[in-house]
Regions:
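Short beta-strand scaffold segments in enzyme catalytic cores
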Residues: 46-48
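Conserved beta-strand edge residues that scaffold enzyme active sites
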Residues: 40, 108-109
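Short acidic/glycine-enriched loop/turn segments that link adjacent beta-strands
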Residues: 40-44, 256-258
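Glyoxalase I/VOC metalloenzyme domain signal
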Residues: 1-8, 13-33, 50-106, 113-276
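Conserved catalytic-core motifs of GNAT/GCN5-like acyltransferases
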Residues: 33-39
């Protein structure tokens, strides 16, 4: 069978029902956010747009029960989203590989522009709950990319130009290795100390043990809170470490081995790092 080539569409930080606080936190950390969006599925969000990928800060309106997975999950990094240009083909490939997925689902959100409001339309192929216990994994097919990647939203005080890396912490990384091999084929992953890496376009997903996570991030890492696996950290490319430092130092950031690191407790449960 032909496996899809993994590319990164976006990453998701869950702020549950605290969208105002979540958005303000990420603005203070130097991200330019889009105006608030409201999905037809019931969730709401702000985006930080980069060159070819983006960060989504997502929440559920208080009292709204249409997106229970948002309120049932802890705050923090909760979604890693692959790109696809053909959601039907991706769905067929996942089925053939034995990966439990839902059929493609379509939704939209209005985007208010100077010339008027238009609907951004998406179709996703989501892995079923429990397949990746660390959080949500899915594919996103954009039908209106011009409404999402707009230049006025791609300039950030912290200098971010893209997502370099996402980190998953797992007591047994081999479980994720087996899943990613089923999704993307033999040779999609390679070993690293305490785990493995999946190359995702110009980015990468590292799946590492708690020991390796602690060595790299120390007390800046998220609290495992009894979880065997969880999505832990994001590393962003920046055009200037000084810009990243100026934007984040008020949030408890530190400089460490050529990077700027923001502790999870200052970024709604997700450790953030900035690199050149």
């Amino acid at each position: 069978m032909i496996h899809p080539v993994p590319t990164l569409d976006h990453v998701v930080v869950n702020v549950r029902d605290r969208i105002d606080e979540g958005a303000e936190t990420y603005r203070r950390l130097g991200f330019t956010l889009t105006p608030r969006g409201f999905h037809t599925l019931g969730s709401m969000n702000h985006l930080a747009m980069f060159g070819t990928d983006y960060l989504e800060v997502i929440a559920a309106p208080p009292g709204d029960t249409r997106r229970p997975e948002i309120m049932e999950a802890p705050e923090g990094l909760n979604g890693l989203v692959f790109g696809t240009e053909d959601s039907a083909a991706t769905y067929a490939a996942m089925q053939s590989a034995g990966v439990p997925v839902f059929p493609p689902g379509e939704f939209s959100r209005p985007v208010v522009l100077p010339e008027g409001s238009r609907d951004a339309v998406f179709r996703t192929v989501r892995l079923m709950p429990g397949v990746a216990p660390s959080g949500r994994l899915y594919f996103c097919h954009h039908f209106t990319r011009d409404l999402v990647w707009r230049d006025e939203w791609r300039h950030h005080p912290n200098g971010t130009t893209g997502i370099a890396r996402a980190v998953i912490c797992a007591r047994d990384p081999s479980e994720f290795g087996a899943l990613f091999t089923r999704m993307f084929g033999e040779g999609a992953t390679r070993p690293i100390d305490g785990g493995f890496v999946l190359t995702v376009g110009v980015s990468r997903f590292d799946v590492i043990t708690p020991r390796v996570l602690a060595v790299e991030f120390g007390d800046a890492a998220p609290d495992a809170a009894g979880r065997d696996s969880f999505m832990a950290a994001l590393e962003f490319r920046t055009g200037s470490l000084d810009a990243a430092w100026r934007a984040t130092e008020g949030g408890g950031a530190r400089r460490d081995r050529g990077r700027v690191i923001v502790p999870a407790n200052a970024a709604f449960g997700a450790t953030l790092a900035f690199c050149l």
